[in-house]
A protein has these predicted regions:
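Post-transcriptional modification and biogenesis factors for structured RNAs
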Residues: 1-199
Length: 199
């Protein structure tokens, strides 16, 4: 690589680091976790949601392959942690990062998301399309929530469910003044240049 190429590469890296810092500025830390998802497009969509909502990380357990094109480069800015589908390893990661477990699951004691009061550092765990979340994680979660559904088939797409819960959390943070940029940075229908609020 030439000196000119190195200079450009360093400038790009510096710009990316600056944009990443600005991108996360003022938003509360939270994570999205997926337990053994079998449909790759769902993972890609969750990564895009995590990026749009400025999640600190996405935790994937089990399956290592996922639909990178569905993420639309959001994976460049969102940390993706891959773990084995091991309950002990997952618990250890939550403790290490200081996350409070919030399971998204249809269960008898689930709280409707409309009534949910989320903990300060939630990690929203979604279960596999077939099988759901391991029962021991449901039992020890700080909160178990479900999304109200009025249709005859009580089953939302996993990525859609994750998006709904994340944005319910952000809406509640906004109501108490927890978001520095509640408009998501949109000005006049466009995203301004980072570091220049006027675009």
């Amino acid at each position: 690589m030439t000196t000119k190429d190195e200079y450009r590469a360093n400038r790009r890296a510096d710009r990316r680091a600056r944009r990443l810092k600005e991108y996360r500025h003022g938003l509360r830390p939270f994570a999205i976790a997926a337990w053994e998802i079998s449909k790759e497009h769902n993972v890609g969509t969750l990564v895009r949601t995590a990026h749009a909502a400025a999640a600190t990380e996405v935790i994937l357990t089990g399956e290592r392959e996922w639909n990178v094109p569905a993420a639309r480069t959001a994976d460049l800015y969102t940390e993706i942690v891959q773990l084995d589908a091991d309950v002990a390893a997952f618990r250890a990661h939550l403790r290490h990062r200081g996350w409070s477990l919030v399971v998204v699951e249809l269960a008898d004691d689930s709280v409707n998301i409309f009534d949910a009061v989320y903990p300060e550092r939630p990690c929203f765990l979604l279960g596999a399309e077939l099988g759901g979340v391991p029962p021991e994680l449901v039992a020890e979660a700080e909160l178990v929530v479900q999304i109200p559904q009025w249709g005859l088939v009580p089953c939302l797409n996993l990525a859609v469910a994750g998006s709904l819960v994340v944005y319910d959390h952000l809406a509640k943070r906004h109501r108490v003044g927890g978001l520095s940029r509640p408009d998501g940075g949109l000005v006049g229908g466009r995203i301004p240049a980072f570091g220049n609020p006027d675009g």
